[in-house]
Amino acid sequence: MRQNDFENTSMLKLVMSLAIPSMIAQLVNILYSIVDRMFVGQIEEVGNVCLAAVGICGPIVTLLSSFGTLVGIGGSIWLSMCLGQKNEKRASQILYNSFVMLVVLSICLTLGFILLKHNLIYWFGGSDALYPYANTYLTIYTLGTFFALMSIGLNYFITGQGYATIAMLSVCIGAITNIMFDFILIRTLKIGVAGAAIGTVVAQFISCMFVLCFLRFKSKIKLHKEELSIEKMKHIVKLGFSPFLIIASDSIILIVMNMMLQKYGGDMGDIYISAITVAQSYFLLITGPLLGISSGTQPIFAYHFGSQNLKKIKEAFKIVISFAFLFCLVMFIISMCYSNVFVAMFTNDAMTMPIADRAIKIFCLGILMMSIQYVLVDGITGLSNVKLSLFLSLNRKLMYLGCTCLLPAFLGVSNIFYAQPTADIYASIVTIICFIKIIPSYLKSHGVK
């Protein structure tokens, strides 16, 4: 297995060696939800209802998983800084404290969501027609929360040590397992949404075991018992809170969107939720790899911030932004030309298909600007400026939430989709201005030259 050399590898090669495996890992990771929805949407007679039910569960499931990101990104950024400072002892302590945090969080979240799931489904846009399917899916998935948080959270520590290909492999193993079980349980054994949830949990279990074994026996910084520290745990949360907020608030906004679609959609409420589920699935094909680029290259910024190398930080930003923009440009062209092909993979319902196709095209209007915003916010987090990255994250989410609530009320339910590009373009402009005005002096004040 090859570990990346942050100090001596050329920046372009280093960025590509971290970004591409991380992109692929994120892309494969979203197949967990997308493949579930594809198989579920094709179930005979009840496919469209099942698709909407899984769509209701999607943001709730992502909200659960975001706690893995909280610990994973926060801990791995700090670990990378410690490696840049040649402090392997502290890096080992960070890894163990993060592991304990994930164990405790998984237990608390499992109990909490099991107790509240009935209310959550109805609060977040469910109807009587959707409830049986949503309840089945959410119950099974929640019971596997431990495996989900471990596989998601600890995988960041593999990337943070430079083993990007291994991190990608762990996700690929889980995704391939999920696809196999979905085919067997849904298509062959015909057990519906339960099969989709079971397949996901089994896949996360296998991925979890792979990650634990690698960190225990193979990585440079190995997982073993260290002293627990509340102060270290607080700092992990501090570093991980901004990316956690991005993912968690995305889930909350999608939940609110489902609620607005039911409220203003009338008899078409479930159909709108099916359509938005398809559109959101497509958008994940953009935001997932984009997050892979921005979060996968965070260790570069963290390492060179730790070693106080301004030249390397500047070079990294230029290359990462260029790569992210190029990716989003390609996806923008595909979105405008071939979105109908993607919609047909999920449903053949005549009422759902045109709504979903239109939603995809509208969602993607702001992705070119969004590419810059993602890289800058995650890069700022990598530079340990948590307050600024948190502000920029909240700024975008508040705009998105406001548009989601106001657009259907004043312009009709079909225009709720414009909330996405409006928030993306607005937030990107604010982020660019703040980055130019604040970051140079911030780096100088921390001795980065």
Language model features by range: what are they?
Residues 1-19, 79-146, 188-241, 301-366, ...:
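Short alpha-helical transmembrane segments in multi-pass integral membrane proteins
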Residues 6-38, 42-46, 59-74, 78, ...:
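N-terminal transmembrane alpha-helices
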Residues 16, 31-32, 71, 112-116, ...:
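Residue-level signal for transmembrane alpha-helical positions in Major Facilitator Superfamily
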Residues 17-36, 140, 174, 203-207, ...:
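Transmembrane helical elements of multi-pass membrane transporters/channels
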Residues 20, 36, 75, 116-117, ...:
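Hydrophobic/aromatic residues in alpha-helical transmembrane segments
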Residues 27, 31-51, 121-128, 184-191, ...:
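Helix-terminus/linker motif at the lipid-water interface of multi-pass membrane proteins
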Residues 51-111, 148-167, 258, 273-339, ...:
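Small-residue-rich hydrophobic transmembrane alpha-helices
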Residues 141-159, 167-175, 196-211, 290-294, ...:
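Short runs within selected transmembrane alpha-helices of multi-pass transporters and secretion channels
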